[in-house]
Amino acid sequence: NNDKKLVELFLNSKIGKKCFSFSELNINETLPLIKNCDLYIGNDTGWLHISSALGLRCLGLFMDSPVMAYGKYSKNISIIIPEGETEESTTHDTLGKDKISYEKVFNKASELLN
C-alpha cells in the first residue's frame, strides 16, 4: 500500500540509514527499541504517546485527530498537521492523510535530529 512506499522512501533517504520500521514487530519487541531511539515519527497513536512518555523526541502526524486534545501535553511532541488545517481545526474526521507531504515530514525530522 502507499504507506509502505512512504516508509521505504524514508528508509532509503540520507537519514534513513539510522532508521527502521516497527510495522512487523509486536509490542514486546518494540518497547526496548523505542527506548533506544532518538526520534519517533508517526501518526497520533499509542506509539506516539508511549514514545513521548519514554522521553523521546516525537514527530506526531495529526492527520485525523485533534492536536489540541492529544498533541499539546508534552514538550517531547512536535506536530505536523494537514495542509489547510490549523491546530484548532484538526478533528477525528479531518481525513488529512493525503495533505501531509513527505518533504514536510522529512524536513522536520531532519531538523529534530540535528
Regions found by a protein language model. Give the residues of each.
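Homeobox/homeodomain signature
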Residues: 15, 60, 70, 87-90
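Gly/Pro- and small hydrophobic-enriched strand-loop and loop-to-helix capping segments
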Residues: 54-82
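Flexible, glycine-rich phosphate/dinucleotide-binding loops
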Residues: 3-5, 67-68, 86
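Donor-binding and catalytic core of enzymes assembling or modifying cell-surface/extracellular glycoconjugates
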Residues: 1-63
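Leloir-type glycosyltransferase catalytic cores
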Residues: 74-114
